[in-house]
Curated annotation (Swiss-Prot):
Gene: mdcG
GO MF annotation: an example: nucleotidyltransferase activity
Keyword list, A-Z: Nucleotidyltransferase, Transferase
Annotated protein name in UniProt: Phosphoribosyl-dephospho-CoA transferase
EC numbers: 2.7.7.66
Coiled-coil ranges (or none): none
Length: 206
């Protein structure tokens, strides 16, 4: 692959043979069925990418590593913004409701979580009580007031909406950045740390 996979990207091509020897049967079955894996934030050796395998149930998640040479297909969250589903679940209603706001917000956005997984793969992952997980590519600062305005829009949705701001230094939850705390949790492949500015994370907790 020319481009390095990013967190939340979906990758096809991993086989059960790449799983740890003690991998549960559900993980073997998931890969054998042709399901994609999702890129996670973790350090990996050269030639590998840290991924997560999904099972049918929420508690079925397995951390693993995929060979970069095995990647047959990659789908990013932003490639799923306009994808529809025949299943008229609350989470899809929320996505349709918020699309105009997100399209006009000025940043690149994408769909992740169970919704992104099902829209990209066709494998059932959404249910009646699913949250809508989104990402926003924010290479430059989004002000806290801008974050609060987005949260206000999301509060009108029919289901819970969780959005992660993707900064050059890691990810921070939109709701946290829209809050009043002086420092927020920034997550990247190396660590999770408290910072006052996710776009200039010089102040970190020990």
């Amino acid at each position: 692959m020319v481009n390095t996979p990013l967190a939340h990207d979906l990758l096809w091509g991993m086989t059960p043979a790449q799983l740890p020897a003690d991998a549960p049967q559900w993980a073997i079955d998931s890969l054998a069925a042709g399901q994609p894996v999702v890129v996670r934030r973790a350090l990996s050796e050269d030639g590998c990418v840290a991924v997560g395998v999904r099972g049918r149930f929420r508690e079925q998640r397995l951390a693993a590593f995929m060979s970069v040479d095995s990647i047959a297909c990659r789908v990013s969250p932003e490639a799923l913004c306009q994808v529809e589903s025949a299943r008229d679940l609350p989470v899809m209603q929320a996505l349709r409701q918020l699309r105009p706001v997100l399209d006009d917000c000025g940043w690149t956005w994408g769909v992740s979580g169970s919704v992104g997984f099902e829209l990209a793969s066709g494998f059932t992952a959404m249910h009646e009580r699913s949250d809508l997980d989104l990402i926003l590519r924010t290479p430059q600062l989004i002000t806290r007031n801008q974050a609060r305005k987005l949260v206000a829009y999301f509060e009108q949705a029919i289901c819970r909406v969780d959005l992660q701001l993707q900064t050059p230094f890691g990810a921070v939850a939109l709701r946290e950045w829209a809050g009043n705390a002086s420092r927020v949790l920034l997550k990247n492949a190396r660590e999770a740390c408290l910072v006052s500015d996710p776009w200039n994370p010089q102040e970190q907790a020990a």
